[in-house]
Amino acid sequence: MGKPQETILIIGAGIAGLTASRLPTNNGIPNIVFEASTPERNQGFAISLQEFGYSSLLAALGDLPLSNLTRGVAPDRQIGGTGWIDQALRDNRTGELLVAPDLTTMKQTIVRANRNALRHWIADCGEDELDVRYGHKLRRIEGKLGDITAVFENHAKYKGSLVIAADGVNSTTRSQILPNVIPETIPLIHYHGEFQVSHSAFDKLIRPHSGHSNILVGVGDRFNTPLSICNVTKTKVHLDWSYSRPVKGENDTLYRPNVPSEEAKQIPPALLEELDALSLAEPWKNFLNSESLKTHRVFHWTTRCVYITQDDARRAGEQGVVFVGDSWHAMPIFGGEGGNHALLDGVELANAIIKSTASGGKDGWDNVVKSYYAGAWKRSQEAVRRSTQRFFLLHRPAKEWKEISEKKKKPA
């Protein structure tokens, strides 16, 4: 079936694809990463990294300390921060603290990371530079495991032994190899906004409420409004907000799952009206209003989940394709675990490749694929279901939040 010594072709330069490239590169295993976009693409929002995700990556990179990661990726790294979050939930209409862990006994296990910074940090964690080729949009895959060719829209062709599909929820690779797997659209409204303020404005308007936490989570009556630090520079604090809620009936004007990409960047009047009617408390009301949104970059995000059966994974493997990241386990962003499983995918697949290569490749590519999916399939597919359920639980009625808060206050 071919020895695991030939070039690996990786489609997509997100955190899963870069992890799947960095670790083999550090072990002398040739691979090429192909990315459809330009090097300037922006994914500057922040994500939450959990211990099960980053600890595996740090171990695979040579037992690096957590401080190495936080110095490189924490949104507040330029002011000495470590990406810390308080894990608290507040009533976004009163500011009341509803749920919060005991900060005196809690160690930092969740790290906020700027996504752009994380991509660069992974790419830089080794002596040899990664071979990332931008402007390569996949057209099709030809061949089989051990002898496969990737053909791109710029007419470039590359041969390899294995294709790693790291090209996201709308994976071109998956749509060709497994056309029966169609992302499931979740009936949720999700708008995302980006803006920046001066340090003095941040210290006046947000810091009194957030403290040193990199995210200020506000929950309401079936809707959420988290405010998050994306990046801190010498002069500005870059932030984002989300407004999310379940769909209301069949004629919800804000539910536009198939909106064209350019139209998704436009602010619908119905959103402005809805935000102004929420009666938010500070600091949310200072930013989530029709006047402030005039200076924000606002995006409509469609929430989609992807499930792949074991048989689908096996069939794709026989055709020379293995999946990592959102291409096979996309899940809700807020309350999800997607970035962590993307890291874990890259680590576990790379470990299977490295192990097979160390044995002289006698196991073949088919056993690399089987070894990877033996653990990754159940882990990731369960996470999709868990994250989707958690998303709806985080959008519960205000009455239920109050009941939870009261129970937390009662002595054990």
Curated annotation (Swiss-Prot):
SUPFAM superfamilies: FAD/NAD(P)-binding domain. Pathway: Secondary metabolite biosynthesis. Its cofactor is FAD. The keyword Cell membrane does not apply. One of its GO terms (molecular function) is monooxygenase activity. Residues 1-21 form the signal peptide. The keyword Ribonucleoprotein does not apply. Glycans are attached at N68, N92, N170, N231, N251. FAD binds at E35, A46, R119, D326, G339. Belongs to the paxM FAD-dependent monooxygenase family. This is FAD-dependent monooxygenase nscC. The gene is nscC.
